[in-house]
Amino acid sequence: MDKTKITVVTIGHMPAEFNKGKVTSWNSSVFEITGEIESYTLTKDSDGSAWEFTDSSLEEVLPDTFQGDFLAAIVNVPLELNWYTRRLHNNRLVFTFHEIKEILIHSNIPLENIIYRLIYAYTLFYKRSGNKIQMTGEHTNFAHDETRGCLFDMNGIKTDIIYSCHNPIIYPNCIEKLKQEKVSNEVISKVQKEITRI
């Protein structure tokens, strides 16, 4: 089984508590982070009515070319609709520490845990979507509304994110969906084993 290759970058100022080295040194048999986590400057101002950065604005800031199968960009600014992650064109996604950082720190959860959780969730999403990251506007059934401590929790109430950032699971219904969408039993089993380290 080939590992999914992921390019991780940061855009703009990062929280002092975030350790990029921990993310690059994470050992997985399912994915591989390509190279080091490079840092880019946030060259635009917010363009949304609530001081958020819209998808179209971030499309212009994120690198267009990268080595991995998909690109995960980490920012520390508000995103469109106040979500904490958005899926963009060309197999790119963005995650923000905005509001999430304080929630994790308050619960004594390392900031890196949300990155591990999202990398596993998006790796499975990439595989079940035919090796692509579908855009935010595309209907995917990627996440569920109810908080279950699962990789695929929506976390519409952001404070619920703590339940999937410490010893997360893959909920049984989500496992069945992954199998129906042709993710191998071996990949699912490896992810289940590895996420116990989060």
Q: What positions do the PLM features span?
A:
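Hydrophobic transmembrane alpha-helix bundles
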Residues: 71-80, 107-117, 172-173
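Active-site-adjacent loop/helix micro-motif of nuclease/hydrolase catalytic cores
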Residues: 53, 81-84, 104-106
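N-terminal pre-first-transmembrane soluble regions of secretory-pathway and organelle membrane proteins
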Residues: 1-76, 134, 162
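Metalloprotease/metallohydrolase-associated module, dominated by Zn2+-dependent proteases
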Residues: 131-198
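A short, glycine/acidic-enriched catalytic loop
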Residues: 89-99
